[in-house]
Amino acid sequence: MNTEAEQQLLHHARNGNAEEVRQLLETMARNEVIADINCKGRSKSNLGWTPLHLACYFGHRQVVQDLLKAGAEVNVLNDMGDTPLHRAAFTGRKELVMLLLEYNADTTIVNGSGQTAKEVTHAEEIRSMLEAVERTQQRKLEELLLAAAREGKTTELTALLNRPNPPDVNCSDQLGNTPLHCAAYRAHKQCALKLLRSGADPNLKNKNDQKPLDLAQGAEMKHILVGNKVIYKALKRYEGPLWKSSRFFGWRLFWVVLEHGVLSWYRKQPDAVHNIYRQGCKHLTQAVCTVKSTDSCLFFIKCFDDTIHGFRVPKNSLQQSREDWLEAIEEHSAYSTHYCSQDQLTDEEEEDTVSAADLKKSLEKAQSCQQRLDREISNFLKMIKECDMAKEMLPSFLQKVEVVSEASRETCVALTDCLNLFTKQEGVRNFKLEQEQEKNKILSEALETLATEHHELEQSLVKGSPPASILSEDEFYDALSDSESERSLSRLEAVTARSFEEEGEHLGSRKHRMSEEKDCGGGDALSNGIKKHRTSLPSPMFSRNDFSIWSILRKCIGMELSKITMPVIFNEPLSFLQRLTEYMEHTYLIHKASSLSDPVERMQCVAAFAVSAVASQWERTGKPFNPLLGETYELVRDDLGFRLISEQVSHHPPISAFHAEGLNNDFIFHGSIYPKLKFWGKSVEAEPKGTITLELLEHNEAYTWTNPTCCVHNIIVGKLWIEQYGNVEIINHKTGDKCVLNFKPCGLFGKELHKVEGYIQDKSKKKLCALYGKWTECLYSVDPATFDAYKKNDKKNTEEKKNSKQMSTSEELDEMPVPDSESVFIIPGSVLLWRIAPRPPNSAQMYNFTSFAMVLNEVDKDMESVIPKTDCRLRPDIRAMENGEIDQASEEKKRLEEKQRAARKNRSKSEEDWKTRWFHQGPNPYNGAQDWIYSGSYWDRNYFNLPDIY
């Protein structure tokens, strides 16, 4: 492009140099100069304006005419969203407005301030002219809509209805027929459905007092019109200035917008145009408006949550009255209420839907007729072959032909009825699908809006500043996400705390501690034939920043979460069976418990093991792969003194069973887990159903418990983070001792973030010991009286701090409500039971894996020849993801899921039940709960008749 020529064109257009403009346009037409006739200025005097904008604004008619003749875009927008028509109307240049209209300038385009050309002009004559042109253009669109409906041109009809300013869907021709009338009497089914979905009223009558139903041609069209009585007409956006009452600020002027059943308010009109800086919103589901007779401008809206919002129409508002607002609010409230509370079909809709029994009966009748026809034809052919065509045979021959002919007619009639019955439902079912999609859209948008605003509110509360908009979720964790609170104990080495490691070397605890650290550092211990464990994965994880879990979940509203197929990018390269194996990372605590003689100290170690079992989940927001039915996993760790086998024993519901045992026969650890998922809108909660059992064989003791609830926050907006909460009750079934641990929810300002507290009690509920710490860091034990005294004093200090904050507004604004980095205060006399090992330096690039998790999917040729073909390590999609081959992992995951579905269908056809190989269902021997018990014989290595699942 010749920028110099463009600058000259802009300059001459601004100054009205018609001859120079004409010469430039001629050279451009001859291709002697390559320049854009719609170029935009870059200097201060013409920034973002085209030559046509400048000529219209400064009133140079000849220049405008030459530019339009040369092909300048008549509806081109400048940087403020104005068209040349906006500029000509604003400056009151009637002759230029008429010229632009001759070249089909669009009068309905809205600029950046939300105004059309007629709304920016100050000349009444120009406004009247633009209104007349607008009516003419609108009528042309209506005629095109009527023609498209008559001729069945669905594509053109859809394009017209999807315009920014669509024609009136209930417009009429000279006979009073609406587009729906036209589609009905021409039997254009798809056009009728589109019109109904766009708000066409099926109850309007033409000049002959006929509804569309009266003109409908064909049973299908009549059924569509009868079955769509509950359609709500398409809502138009309604907006304008309103005063809004506030408890703290009194009456403030906002630009208020009604759209899709939502009332939103903004500080300025341009903010509403671009949908930015929204100050608040309310969904109008079941909203009720009230007015005061003493004030013609005031009205109130009572929302579904019983909140009341007061609004006042500005007294100088000429175009909008209180009645206009009330009517618009009523329409949007009805729309939102309809789609947000339509839980079940009405009686009329139930009648429109043919039952499965009727469809089956119709099909069976058709099949019976078909079978009769086959028999008659066979007999007929046989008779022909045996017939010598004697005269005496002719009457019987003709009679048989009539029978066959009659059977054929009956078959055709039956099949036609059957086909009509099925096709009759198509329109109704398509419409119901559209309704559900619209309902889904409304609900998902409402949920996303609430979550986003709640997120902004909590962020503003944490930062101590007033919210930029009203209401969303757990934002202070974004501030915490980069903190090192989970590693704070590494800075507490100088604290004098009595620990099992310091006082119990004779119990062998140091030996187990050293063996664990040796393993994490890549030692030489043998495990499944691997001499030296890897310290990283073959490929780092892919960034998930460009992907949104909400974009997937919003399409799955109403589905069971366990059945939702997530893209592989949200996974981590481990099966859920391998994730379960991470319970064993701190096995030294079990060995330690087995070696202790005091039952209370044993309970302390078991409690520490139960807490440590969930520690690896911190920052592990990747989803493990769902195990396939029959999938197994084994792990042998000579260095840690255990071996484990697990199997996916059920697919729906998904249940994983595991069994681990000490290599020195000192313990057995087993259980079955069914992660029951719940979607709470802003978070996904996983409640691990199932009993965990630990048996200390040397003491003939058994402990049972269930894991806490795990919750992933900020599904819709913000950074994902994980929380564990709920009570965990560990029972010693021999002594009757009980340990009750409370995994605390974080609270609004994170004071209880990751905290775990509880007591060990005897069977008479006497407190024997207190436990406290964080599931991400450590666990301590202390005398219960000392702990209670500390808690009482801590509560008192907290209240004093709260009061002091309330006294100083400036302090409140400056203070960040984030927990102290050294967040576990060690009470004097405490005993350290467990402390988490630091994660490897490359953990953040390796799905936040611990050193223990890093080796779970490791495999070599020697191991491959030993493990069964159902082992997770041989699963191709997990292996591909571990190697960084995301596309292949996705393809393999899809292939395995389809293979699993096909196998399930084959079993259902053959009425064959699935049989688990290594576990069987039965009651837990200690609490009687339903459980999966290890059947034995896995370690004999006789792997015959294993299913082909990969």
UniProtKB/Swiss-Prot annotation:
Chain coiled-coil ranges: 430-463, 877-913
UniProt xrefs under InterPro entries: Ankyrin_rpt, Ankyrin_rpt-contain_sf, OSBP_sf, Oxysterol-bd, Oxysterol-bd_CS, PH-like_dom_sf, PH_domain
Subcellular localization: Late endosome
Residue numbers spanned by region Disordered: 501-527, 795-816, 881-913
Sites bearing Phosphoserine, chain numbering: 499
Residue interval(s) of motif FFAT: 469-485
Molecular function GO terms recorded: cholesterol binding; phospholipid binding; sterol transfer activity
UniProt xrefs under PROSITE patterns: ANK_REP_REGION (PS50297), ANK_REPEAT (PS50088), OSBP (PS01013), PH_DOMAIN (PS50003)
Keywords attached to this entry: ANK repeat, Coiled coil, Endosome, Lipid transport, Lipid-binding, Phosphoprotein, Repeat, Transport
Entries under SUPFAM superfamilies matching the protein: Ankyrin repeat, Oxysterol-binding protein-like, PH domain-like
Region (Interaction with RAB7A): 1-237
GO terms, biological process: bile acid biosynthetic process; cholesterol metabolic process; vesicle-mediated transport
Ranges of compositional bias, category Basic and acidic residues: 501-521, 890-901
Self-association and partners: Interacts (via FFAT motif) with VAPA and VAPB. Interacts with the GTP-bound form of RAB7A. Interacts with OAS1B. Interacts (via FFAT motif) with MOSPD2 (via MSP domain).
Domains as described in the record: The FFAT motif is required for interaction with MOSPD2, VAPA and VAPB.
PANTHER family given in the database record: OXYSTEROL-BINDING PROTEIN-RELATED (PTHR10972), OXYSTEROL-BINDING PROTEIN-RELATED PROTEIN 1 (PTHR10972:SF53)
Function of the molecule: Binds phospholipids; exhibits strong binding to phosphatidic acid and weak binding to phosphatidylinositol 3-phosphate. Stabilizes GTP-bound RAB7A on late endosomes/lysosomes and alters functional properties of late endocytic compartments via its interaction with RAB7A. Binds 25-hydroxycholesterol and cholesterol.
Protein name in the entry: Oxysterol-binding protein-related protein 1
Organism: Homo sapiens
Gene name tied to this protein: OSBPL1A
